Amino acid sequence: MKFMSATAVFAAALSSVTEASSIQDQIKNTDCNVSKLGYSTSQAFTDMMLADNTEYRAADSVSFYDFSTSSRLPRKHLSSSSEASPTTEGVSSSSSGETDEKTEEELDNGGIIYAREKLTISESQDSLSNQSIELHDNSIFFGEGEVIFDHRVALKNGGAIYGEKEVVFENIKSLLVEVNIAVEKGGSVYAKERVSLENVTEATFSSNGGEQGGGGIYSEQDMLISDCNNVHFQGNAAGATAVKQCLDEEMIVLLAECVDSLSEDTLDSTPETEQTESNGNQDGSSETEDTQVSESPESTPSPDDVLGKGGGIYTEKSLTITGITGTIDFVSNIATDSGAGVFTKENLSCTNTNSLQFLKNSAGQHGGGAYVTQTMSVTNTTSESITTPPLIGEVIFSENTAKGHGGGICTNKLSLSNLKTVTLTKNSAKESGGAIFTDLASIPITDTPESSTPSSSSPASTPEVVASAKINRFFASTAKPAAPSLTEAESDQTDQTETSDTNSDIDVSIENILNVAINQNTSAKKGGAIYGKKAKLSRINNLELSGNSSQDVGGGLCLTESVEFDAIGSLLSHYNSAAKEGGAIHSKTVTLSNLKSTFTFADNTVKAIVESTPEAPEEIPPVEGEESTATEDPNSNTEGSSANTNLEGSQGDTADTGTGDVNNESQDTSDTGNAESEEQLQDSTQSNEENTLPNSNIDQSNENTDESSDSHTEEITDESVSSSSESGSSTPQDGGAASSGAPSGDQSISANACLAKSYAASTDSSPVSNSSGSEEPVTSSSDSDVTASSDNPDSSSSGDSAGDSEEPTEPEAGSTTETLTLIGGGAIYGETVKIENFSGQGIFSGNKAIDNTTEGSSSKSDVLGGAVYAKTLFNLDSGSSRRTVTFSGNTVSSQSTTGQVAGGAIYSPTVTIATPVVFSKNSATNNANNTTDTQRKDTFGGAIGATSAVSLSGGAHFLENVADLGSAIGLVPGTQNTETVKLESGSYYFEKNKALKRATIYAPVVSIKAYTATFNQNRSLEEGSAIYFTKEASIESLGSVLFTGNLVTLTLSTTTEGTPATTSGDVTKYGAAIFGQIASSNGSQTDNLPLKLIASGGNICFRNNEYRPTSSDTGTSTFCSIAGDVKLTMQAAKGKTISFFDAIRTSTKKTGTQATAYDTLDINKSEDSETVNSAFTGTILFSSELHENKSYIPQNVVLHSGSLVLKPNTELHVISFEQKEGSSLVMTPGSVLSNQTVADGALVINNMTIDLSSVEKNGIAEGNIFTPPELRIIDTTTGGSGGTPSTDSESNQNSDDTEEQNNNDASNQGESANGSSSPAVAAAHTSRTRNFAAAATATPTTTPTATTTTSNQVILGGEIKLIDPNGTFFQNPALRSDQQISLLVLPTDSSKMQAQKIVLTGDIAPQKGYTGTLTLDPDQLQNGTISVLWKFDSYRQWAYVPRDNHFYANSILGSQMLMVTVKQGLLNDKMNLARFEEVSYNNLWISGLGTMLSQVGTPTSEEFTYYSRGASVALDAKPAHDVIVGAAFSKMIGKTKSLKRENNYTHKGSEYSYQASVYGGKPFHFVINKKTEKSLPLLLQGVISYGYIKHDTVTHYPTIRERNKGEWEDLGWLTALRVSSVLRTPAQGDTKRITVYGELEYSSIRQKQFTETEYDPRYFDNCTYRNLAIPMGLAFEGELSGNDILMYNRFSVAYMLSIYRNSPTCKYQVLSSGEGGEIICGVPTRNSARGEYSTQLYLGPLWTLYGSYTIEADAHTLAHMMNCGARMTF
């Protein structure tokens, strides 16, 4: 850099100087020839000479030669243009006389201060006293706590300050360091040791620049910023071209004055001498300098010459920030290389800082905000968790840009923790990691030789001829290497990082933060926001990932190994996008765990587009006047603030020129043009900054309309610069010198063109491989890879420079040159995706994976996983059944792909979900219209797509999902094996899903074992709208399984998602619910597919499943639930039913005329073959209740246990039928059980049941009272065609064998149920280039279990049981006369009928209705029927059951017990606690009551039990000193139960009662002897109660399936009067007391009249029970005390004599017959005993707890009464 052409440097720099109006008038213009060192092309330019303020202007073409340079540019006080601050007066500095003795190091470093020792600057001017410094300028401003360093230039390092030791700023209120420039490093401050800012209130480093690095501050050690309020780094720049933008008008004037101040005595060497010295250096005479002297402007300098790193701060070690109470920000800093805000060779640590901000910084390479070679960490230690306040601190990275990786941060490891807010927004990168990049090891290391950094303090390293080059610092730059270059230290660090990363932990850690927002970041390759290896985001209260985008994979996050979200409060990820995979998240392993609240992934998109005419995105319109290109290189300039339009245009022109005549190019530019270009630059800079969008991935083009597109894509290298700029001249090799002297016109190059190449080399330094790929990640329309020539039509204009660049052996990560084969994971992409142990709800909504290849193009991409794509495993488990995850509106779609489209919401080979989920309106569609049917693959898995296994165990709801195959769940493997869809536990609902071909669930194996499974109103174009399986299926109901309303129709009128494929032929589509078809295209497999139906814990029902030729043609509907090559097995537990309201129309692969050749259908077969009585004893039911049901099952049916029920007019056609012992075949009127014509099969019936209840009243068919069921035999006529279902019903077998055969020949067998021409679907995941085709998986043929039947015969034996459970048959008036009734139709051919020991049982003698008897008519057995003879007796409305009528009367005893229980509580508790000797008081009582009464059966009464419970509230007071009066209200609820075992009926009643009571007490003395005044103390207590009791009773009669209801009321009175006397009074210190008492108790209960309802009702009259008893007893009282607690206890026993009672008598009458009588209630005996115990616990003067228990017993009755509660005294 030191020995570049002075002319080339000055030509561009000082053109700006002449634009300054402040000096223009002072300068006179003179045209002349000027001689300076170096060479250049001739061009109109303006240069400043060093004498008499004369401006010399050269016009037209001038050859420059014999240049001279000064040995040194002496410093001038640049403050001469403005007055120095008076506050600097007195500060010591070197005298002017000592200037010549200063070293060049001191003169060239430190624009204001050169410090030899530690430099400390505070707010006082005295801070500079007594410090070993060289003060070059007295212009430092000190005043009122303010310190200013501004507008200074250093020819080497430290534009304002240079320190050989530590530099410290401390205790300053306001520090302003602005517009200082260093030609090398440290625009404002350069220090060889630490730089510190401590205790500074306000610090600003603004618009400083360092050409090589450290635009603001450069430290060779570390840097510390601590205990400050606000620190600002704004508009600083690193790198030659970047520094140019720091110039302002004042700085230009100062530079002009500096140039003008060169004194003639410093020019002590002649031009000839200088030229000779220069030539000598170029010839290699100097070891230190000649290499650099010999370099032409196109040669490669050492990396440090073009460092361009650290626009704000550069440190060779670490940067530490701590204790910032306000804000530390890095705003609008620029670096032509890396780290526009901060560049540090080691770590960046920020602790206890209120706000750290990186805003609008721009880097030409990596780390637009910060580049940290090792670890960047930001944390606060004020709080340990987000729930422990205060949590302070914010980190903001916003609108930072990088042309390489990491628009915001580029580091090896990042840690953000214990913060209030983290915001990453609108950052962008031309490579990967729009906001954060942490994979430094993946950045290629250039092979460009490195040179050691020249020491700025060494005189030997300073050339003698440098002044001219140093002044023009802004433009002295050279070409950058081909790939991002790293210094040797960085290279070593990268190697160490790469080695240790294998075992490293997390490189992106964001934890314990209140709010994290990652929004609107973009990258041209991977990771729109974050790119790294491992990331963990944990303990975050709110996390938002929104609006990020990438042009490759991972629109939001891209991690090469793993990403983990742990303990997130609220997670929102929406509107992220990527071009290939992972719209929001892309990683090898994705884990979401312990999420505390709702997590949402919404409207994320993966979208790839191939267009016939590429267009720029609408959201980024081209800048006015720029040339639109088809594709733009990701590495082209996006930084409007650093883009010189004219310079970039020159670069493009030079590249296009190649080896042509550059003089023609030179003539295109003028002085005016240069000035206009500078103005355009400023306008373009502002425009680009304002118009740049956060989601933009397209570069802003240059305004020069003549530039070629390869200016964006060409990679500038050392060799390319030389070859393109020198025509025919040799490039210096191995330090060889270029030809000196005056070059020819052909060999010369314009200054601006040279500078343009230098600028391009310093900014456009991405790898060559990037230039060959299109920016847009598109899928190729052919099998060949996308190349640069195909994507960029102008790439050929790059000449040999691009062609000579070495291509890397591997494409860099994110390259889109390969053919795109997968588009997937609209929200999440990973090899393994796990979402576990979350506490809130989950939402995946509106995510999309789209192949938008336009029509006319062809795509082979697979489009998989609209919301989630997992390459190996997807696992969803909340750990709780109360958490739900919803997948709604997710989509995979394609316009033209011949690849696979699958998994509208989720795609993974293995899917495991163990939490409740909802899948709604997800879809997988392929709308390709430019492919043939053989090219287009069927989509599968509208909600879930898989190839290995799907397991759901927490319940799910699938609603309105769409796909070709498996509209809800599609499992399509490459090779048909045992891949299973398994639904376990929970409840599952499949509703209104639409299959454009087949099935809601499509899989080889389907296993359902659920509490609830409902398939409702699902639709398909072909068979099996609910389930389609190709290997095996098992459905087990633990609660309820229902298939209803499923529809197969050729027209899906409501479907708008794509055009369904048409079917060939008019084929009947049986199997509207379930269809099984062998996965074999040639049909060679001979085994049928097992389908097992198990009703173990609930019912299974098929109803209204329909095939409809057109959606509106309901008149030709066929209702069929199951079809296909299916081998059925059915099991139903006791009390459970498998119901078929639709027909079964299965087919078979078996052939032959013998029944043994066909499969066996086992009904209720025990799992243990040795067990005779199976655990499955439930019912299998076929019904025509809803519509015709003619079922055809080509199997040998064996009924092992339970019941097979054929409802009226239902037909079941099987190969053969065998009924095992203990089972039941139930047939109803009009039902048919038949064999089929395909084989010789027999019907073996043992113990048949005929249900008569479905016969309508007055129903007589052809002289018979009902249409009898039929056992039908059909001769074998087809030669064993496979048992396909018949479309027409066979005729009744009332004709001979010939007619029977004619009516049931092969023509009646109809079409095959599996006659559809569409092929079975095979795999797509493992073989994506093939269409779905059934895989030929041959399995060994198994021999069906042989049945022990005789061919084509009905063998009937055992009982024929008649049942009429509802009693409807015998209510038919047709039975009022004797007659013969046909019960069963049999074959008329006696050879086809065997009857053995038939017995008629069941309802043959009805108890109500038309009563009579039925007997078997043996004469009709040979006539093809079984008939009975009916003998009419009489008509009876009700069946007679002898009833005991005592129950209603006995309930009076329960009512009396309610009254007594309340009385006992009032006397034993409330009155016994009364203390009449105390002062007046009031009591509030709250009590709980309970009673239980049991009575054993007696000759006059039934056994019954009664119990009740209730509550009571009482209030009493002392109106007088010795009188207590109170009132109480009680409510009781009771139940009565009576079981009459011998007559098999039960009474169950319930009662509730209300009682009101008053009570009182008074002590008095009974005078025994008036003379002696001897008296007996007595206590009188009394209670009066009134009660209302309501009864409600139901009586069940199981034998006749009837019941009675009775409701009545009781009214009750109870009066009790007790007198007691103390026999023993307590002595001193003794509390024992003995009392004797007597009581008079009277009760009266009156039962009101009532009438029963329902069965044979009775009327009951009033009855009353009265009882007068005299209890007499002895009571013992005493107290226990301790720990200030007093417990008083009382125990008494009494004998109770009933002196009067009546036996209640109730009259009744049976309304139907008029019969009547009297009921005498069984009352207790007259003598009984009663025991009482009560206790009181005194808790103080106001509160008392109490309780009492009473037991009463006699010979037949036992009663328990309890009362407990609390008393409050007030």
UniProtKB/Swiss-Prot annotation:
Disordered as annotated region, ranges: 73-109, 264-311, 481-505, 611-818, 1271-1329
Keywords: Cell outer membrane, Cell wall, Membrane, Secreted, Signal, Transmembrane, Transmembrane beta strand
Pfam families: Autotransporter (PF03797), Chlam_PMP (PF02415), ChlamPMP_M (PF07548)
Compositionally skewed regions (Polar residues) per UniProt: 268-285, 631-675, 682-703, 1303-1319
Record-annotated Autotransporter domain positions: 1477-1770
Compositionally biased region (Low complexity): 85-97, 294-303, 496-505, 719-748, 762-802
Membrane topology: Peripheral membrane protein
Signal peptide boundaries: 1-20
Chief subcellular location: secreted
Subcellular compartments: Secreted, Cell wall; Cell outer membrane
Family designation: Belongs to the PMP outer membrane protein family.
NCBIfam families hit by this protein: POMP_repeat (TIGR01376)
Protein name (Swiss-Prot/TrEMBL): Probable outer membrane protein PmpC
Originating organism: Chlamydia trachomatis serovar D (strain ATCC VR-885 / DSM 19411 / UW-3/Cx)
Primary gene name: pmpC
